[in-house]
Amino acid sequence: VGQVSAGKSSLVNALIGEMAAEVSALPSTDQATVHQCTVDGIDLVHLLIDLPGLDGDKAIQKKIVSQITNSDLVLWVLKANQSARKLDVELRQAVDEFYQLAANQNRKAPKILVLVNQVDRLPPLDEWQPPYDLSNPQTQKGKVIAQAVEFNKEKLNPDIILPLCVSQDVPQFNVDTLQQAIVSAYEDGVNTQLNRRRVEGDRLDLTEEAKRLYHLGEVLFKAYRKQL
């Protein structure tokens, strides 16, 4: 999820190119693109859903809130050199309000992983030599990236926040860290999905479903480890 031109599609391409052996876009509605991935012969349906960009349309915002609250993990993409965060803040408030409703207080919210994308475009533009140690930045670029991360952390209060560059034109930054964060969040995502099914009265045997989901997690983890 994210504003128009935040780089969501580029992020999806980077992730599915690294973590999946086969990828195909499934038919979908409301401008969302659903990606079906296969890892080690196991079909992972709806592993990634690329939502329409935030553009101030309240109807779009409502649909995105519905998708977020029915997701296991949310990747929220921000354009690093764009300081306007009104649309993102409004969406975050709408998501929080959903879980504050009495009818939804037993629901487990998915973890939100905010990605400050396109950090290579932050000043100074003539410097780009990743990786950058943001805990103790030694260059002006590193300091600006650290400031951008802190600014967006205060705006959106995510569970996890990472600076990122997935461009094909310059050296990438933090893609491996993002993959590790997704793998680490998998168990929480499984619990979020099982909670959602339980609250909604899903008749599926949740014990068996939990076993299936954890097995898929093992497959993803092995696929990730192969890249190290």
Across the structure, where does each feature detected by a protein language model lie?
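Conserved C-terminal guanine-recognition region of P-loop GTPase G domains, centered on the G4
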Residues: 39-43, 63-156
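A conditional alpha-helix N-cap/helix-loop micro-motif detector
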Residues: 28, 54-60, 142-145
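C-terminal end of P-loop GTPase domains and the immediately downstream helical coupling element
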Residues: 107, 113, 119-228
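A short hydrophobic beta-strand->loop->alpha-helix junction that borders the nucleotide-binding pocket
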Residues: 25-27, 51-53, 81, 164-168
